């Protein structure tokens, strides 16, 4: 069962909107994504957090959601190939306890690489983060991956790009991180 505080947290995330920022839990782009992408990403984040709520020992925080990772999965530092079972190290069972659902469109003319259309997006940072936690001896449900700016900042006019969050965006992100810590309780960061 999904914790009500997690649902409320995701609703809070969904309220954020800014220029040149994609919100995985509120926004969708039909050129790149399937129709019900927002609903799927919300469910995946709910499942991810609920599995870790009572077991997490660590909160690992990176900078921002990237276009090859959390943008399409709704989960920080977690790419589509991981939730679909195409990753060599991280399996869907480790993340969600079941196979996840991709939200990028296999038939998108805007996704240029055949491998991305076939197997979904793959983010190198995601592999590094997951591998580091697992190699440190943490079980997959003993850490929560998060971004200080949980949304995907992109360069103007270039949807599939990443940019560094502004100071204002980082400040907004800190508020969301505090909300997350209210749900999880105190965790080493």
Regions found by a protein language model. Give the residues of each.
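A polyanion-binding, active-site-adjacent surface
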Residues: 2-188
């Amino acid at each position: 069962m999904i914790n009500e505080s997690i649902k409320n947290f995701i609703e809070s995330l969904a309220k954020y909107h800014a220029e040149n920022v994609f919100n995985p839990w509120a926004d969708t782009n039909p050129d790149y994504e399937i129709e019900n992408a927002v609903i799927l990403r919300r469910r995946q984040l709910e499942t991810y957090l609920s599995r870790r709520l009572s077991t997490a020992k660590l909160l690992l925080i990176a900078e921002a959601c990237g276009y090859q990772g959390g943008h399409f999965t709704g989960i920080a530092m977690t790419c589509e190939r991981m939730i679909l079972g195409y990753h060599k190290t991280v399996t869907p069972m480790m993340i969600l306890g079941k196979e996840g659902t991709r939200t990028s469109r296999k038939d998108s003319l805007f996704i240029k690489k055949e491998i991305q259309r076939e197997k979904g997006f793959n983010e190198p940072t995601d592999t590094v983060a997951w591998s580091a936690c697992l190699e440190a001896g943490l079980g997959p449900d003993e850490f929560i991956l998060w971004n200080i700016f949980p949304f995907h900042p992109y360069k103007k006019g270039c949807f599939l790009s990443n940019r560094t969050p502004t100071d204002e965006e980082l400040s907004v992100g800190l508020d969301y991180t505090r909300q997350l810590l209210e749900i999880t309780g105190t965790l080493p960061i």
